[in-house]
Amino acid sequence: MAKVYFRNENCFDVMKKMAEAKYTVDLVLTSPPYATSRSNVRTQKAIDTYNSRYDICLDNMNEDEYVEWTVKLFNDFDKILEKDGVVLYNISYGSENPNAMWRSISAIIEKTPFMIADCIIWKKKSALPNNVAHNKLTRITEFVYVICRKNEFKTFRCNKKVKNVREDTGQKYYENVFNFVEAPNNDGACKLNKATYSSDLCLWLLDLYADNESTVFDPFMGTGTTGIACERFCDDSTMTCIGCELSEKQVEFSKERLKRYRAEHQDSIEIPFDDDED
């Protein structure tokens, strides 16, 4: 059974506590807000419809704000990520502001200690047809960026298995693992969080970049999908998963979801970097 902790707290505050306590994680696995909400639609009803992806977050930063926010996020990751740790960053571009994603990825490379080591294409099982835009295709894929520190590009962990070793040189040959995965959009509809993100996808990623003793951090836990994936990872796993979420409703939903999965409730308990005031 994994140790799963849900924190109803801003991830930047939690990472500050971690850094001060010198508490580190092996893997960051997350799907951040995409800054996809629309402010240029004509009616209030349309605004309410488009901007209801999450129950409390409008997700409506402009491009410059989003890039600055992303840079701060990754500089904070650098303070808590173990040596040779990896960030798995599921993100896609918005219909109204597609530049925001590309600019934020560029800023990660240029303004933080990190680089893009790989890019995985996630094909979702279904997608809403794009019947209202004359020049945009129906998007059925998203990206998962594999991000490591620039000075750890040759050493960051990945669980590809060795298939053969050349006797005369010792050269290792690894199994083929393609940078393409098909997984469900989500684990079921939830009105609190309409973002696409599934535990099947997370589990596939954990198999590649984690082990039974890994500590996994999700700064945008939402409805607990990363936590469920860590629980599914291995029945006898000692994996730890720490998730942050601003929405109290989503945190409570996550606890109940984990309770249903385990058939017994595990309350969120104090974690090693917590202070006495919580």
Annotate each PLM feature.
Residues M1-K17, K255-D278:
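S-adenosyl-L-methionine
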